[in-house]
Amino acid sequence: MVTYALLGATGATGSSILRHLLQKSPDSLHIQVLVRSKVKLLQAFPDLETTRRPQVHVIQGMSTDSDALSECLRNASIVFMCVAQNGSPIGTTLCQDSARPIISVLQQQQQSEGASYQPCTIVQLRSASLNPALAAQVPAFVHRIVSFCLFANYADIKQACQYYSEAQKQGTLEYILVDPPTLHDANGTHPTGYRLISTEPQATALSYADLGAAMCEIAHRESEFHGRAVGVTATGRVRQTWGVLLRHLLEGGSSRLRETIAKEAVVVRVLCIFLVILACLMSSL
């Protein structure tokens, strides 16, 4: 029996993955889902507890809880890492704070199982903005604006990916990075078409439903993509919801701007103090 673990199933990405797995997966699949709120998950998937094909086991807990993670990751060959935070608040560390205990649990399994240990594959949602080949397709000024506004979120994801890269070198896990463009229609449930890419042209918008289907295909073809970044592009019509994205950009940009101004103010104050001290020393000569 193949086992998939899904972290963050109540978010737009996680729910789209779960929906696709429930509809398209073989009956032999076993899905282990870790969520903060089981009630919220069952509101979105009311038949989940009675589903027998595929089998679904729901674990309530935090993505930083070692016991909950150990239960969720047990025997999993694929781990969908969909824990994320809307916006880009300064200082966010959610992705890396989740990556560290995941790696720790897998290291414990590696030590206990010894030579029989089979590393699982982490399928980590990233962004086309962090993929040089795909980011180069976007006008430079747009890329700079987005990178400025989502700086904290991107820094968090990059650090988490660095942890996975280091763990891969130790044989603890494999990883695949999934790089979609802007994501839309969080409430949509029907894919309209997508294609996996590396450096080919990427459409500006992709629906969450198509992202979920794409991540499931990537998991099915995992051996082709280990240690690589995989882009996703839409091939069908996408219901675009730019208002949500613009709000996240505005919130992230405002936070980054306030941080930048605060840092500059500190530098100015230190410089003023230095000049005052220097003036006092010179007047005493």
Curated annotation (Swiss-Prot):
<comment type="pathway">
    <text>Mycotoxin biosynthesis; aflatoxin biosynthesis.</text>
</comment>
<protein>
    <recommendedName>
        <fullName>Averufin oxidase A</fullName>
        <ecNumber>1.-.-.-</ecNumber>
    </recommendedName>
</protein>
<dbReference type="GO" id="GO:0016020">
    <property type="term" value="C:membrane"/>
</dbReference>
<dbReference type="InterPro" id="IPR016040">
    <property type="entry name" value="NAD(P)-bd_dom"/>
</dbReference>
<dbReference type="InterPro" id="IPR051606">
    <property type="entry name" value="Polyketide_Oxido-like"/>
</dbReference>
<keyword id="KW-0560">Oxidoreductase</keyword>
<keyword id="KW-0325">Glycoprotein</keyword>
<comment type="function">
    <text>Averufin oxidase; part of the gene cluster that mediates the biosynthesis of aflatoxins, a group of polyketide-derived furanocoumarins, and part of the most toxic and carcinogenic compounds among the known mycotoxins. The four major aflatoxins produced by A.parasiticus are aflatoxin B1 (AFB1), aflatoxin B2 (AFB2), aflatoxin G1 (AFG1) and aflatoxin G2 (AFG2). Within the aflatoxin pathway, the averufin oxidase aflI catalyzes the conversion of averufin (AVF) to versiconal hemiacetal acetate (VHA).</text>
</comment>
<comment type="similarity">
    <text>Belongs to the avfA family.</text>
</comment>
<feature type="glycosylation site" description="N-linked (GlcNAc...) asparagine">
    <location>
        <position position="75"/>
    </location>
</feature>
<feature type="transmembrane region" description="Helical">
    <location>
        <begin position="265"/>
        <end position="285"/>
    </location>
</feature>
<dbReference type="GO" id="GO:0016646">
    <property type="term" value="F:oxidoreductase activity, acting on the CH-NH group of donors, NAD or NADP as acceptor"/>
</dbReference>
<keyword id="KW-0812">Transmembrane</keyword>
<dbReference type="InterPro" id="IPR036291">
    <property type="entry name" value="NAD(P)-bd_dom_sf"/>
</dbReference>
<keyword id="KW-1133">Transmembrane helix</keyword>
<dbReference type="GO" id="GO:0045122">
    <property type="term" value="P:aflatoxin biosynthetic process"/>
</dbReference>
<dbReference type="Pfam" id="PF13460">
    <property type="entry name" value="NAD_binding_10"/>
</dbReference>
<dbReference type="GO" id="GO:0016491">
    <property type="term" value="F:oxidoreductase activity"/>
</dbReference>
<feature type="glycosylation site" description="N-linked (GlcNAc...) asparagine">
    <location>
        <position position="187"/>
    </location>
</feature>
<keyword id="KW-0472">Membrane</keyword>
